[in-house]
Amino acid sequence: HVLALIDAETTEELPDASDGKVMLVLDRTPFYGEGGGQVGDTGVIECAGRSIPVVDTKKNSGIYMHICELDGTPVSVGDTVTARIDAVRREAIRRNHSAAHLLQAALRTVLGDHVEQAGSYVDAERVRFDFKHYSAMTEEELARVEALVNEEILRGEEIVTVETDVETARKDGA
């Protein structure tokens, strides 16, 4: 169910003529909200037989805001909706998220346990992993890190998903 609509301000309904970006807050959602360097999910919210594109999802204080492109579809607080993520895109993001973990583990193996994540960006097409180290990596170190990551991928280990807070994740080596 739609809990809130946010256009230029919070409102109870958006009439037929509404076009442009709005935020929908639902009572529950399968969408991942942008956070920790990872982009938010996209997909559709189905309402009254029409599909409303979700172009991004943000999370703020535990509230998921679905950023939607309205094309005149009327939406009101209380409407029953079905939320569907773009599963192909989500899978690509999930794989890149896992690659970031593999990269960090390989960096720690090659460079030492002092390596810590200093930032990251994960989307469906790429991963950027920022880390702290006291010198530039050599060509040999880069090759060893790449080989370790590729070996882990080829092993095809089952992926275990754990949801935790940042502090616990850091203690566990993330």
Feature map (PLM): residue ranges:
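A glycine- and charged-residue-rich anion-binding loop/surface
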Residues: 1-174
